[in-house]
Amino acid sequence: MALIGKSERFSADFVMGGAAAIVAKSAAAPIERVKLLLQNQGEMIKTGHLIRPYTGLGNCFTRIYREEGVLSFWRGNQANVIRYFPTQASNFAFKGYFKNLLGCSKEKDGYLKWFAGNVASGSAAGATTSLFLYHLDYARTRLGTDAKECSVNGKRQFKGMIDVYRKTLSSDGIKGLYRGFGVSIVGITLYRGMYFGMYDTIKPIVLVGSLEGNFLASFLLGWSITTSAGVIAYPFDTLRRRMMLTSGQPVKYRNTIHALREILKSEGFYALYRGVTANMLLGVAGAGVLAGYDQLHQIAYKHWVQ
């Protein structure tokens, strides 16, 4: 067991994390597309790719259905699944790797150091994964915000994921695929640190006794953590996606501070939180990933022990 422990554990974490993510993200794809449109409508109106603003969650759902059809709720989902499988699976796997690397133990190092180790391992996992896979998130964002209601020529900007890469590389080069990457690392580090760190820290305190191994309890804990982390990190997500949408446009934000100033000046503070309600609903999918991964983890290691 000692010889195969590390390599098999890394592989199992990778596969189980990705499998849980694919199911949850595909189910939540309609909500995620609504969130992207609400969050980025200011930029879309500015560039002429949206005629009038969405007034809320219900209005956005209605207009997508009426103007684009049911299947359009899954527009960009292919890119999302391609992105999310390696992203989520790598996050779980790298989290375990960094956690073992730091080697913090609650019994040996005390609660505070153990908590800090959990937060650090979650943050490092998110940052490492993003370095390799950010361009896929860019493609997903561009497809998700590509509304049919366009005042430029009445057509969509992109035919599909390959077209996103082709047009972006042609107009902006590799840099265009990584626009907003800097602020993304800050936001992801904050979000993943809370997402993984708090879950790993609170789980052994809350999920004990009759609640140990309980899917509903694990799900509710995961939902509360993903919602809290998502709300805190949301402005960073808005900034990076707004910067993404300027690739291929004649006028771009010079940097994150410039983007923040321009958005606050023209749209106000609330613009940083547009779509946050939909994002909270997406926390249900995130909680499902955490709870599902936890259940798969228990089943797999029980099998290994036997």
Curated annotation (Swiss-Prot):
UniProt-recorded name of the protein: ADP,ATP carrier protein ER-ANT1
Pfam families, per the entry: Mito_carr
Gene: ER-ANT1
Family, as annotated: Belongs to the mitochondrial carrier (TC 2.A.29) family.
Location of the region described as Important for transport activity in the Swiss-Prot/TrEMBL record: 240-245
Lineage start: Eukaryota, Viridiplantae, Streptophyta, Embryophyta, Tracheophyta
Catalytic reaction(s) noted: ADP(in) + ATP(out) = ADP(out) + ATP(in)
Keyword match Endoplasmic reticulum: yes
Organism: Arabidopsis thaliana (Mouse-ear cress)
Molecular-function annotations in GO: ATP:ADP antiporter activity
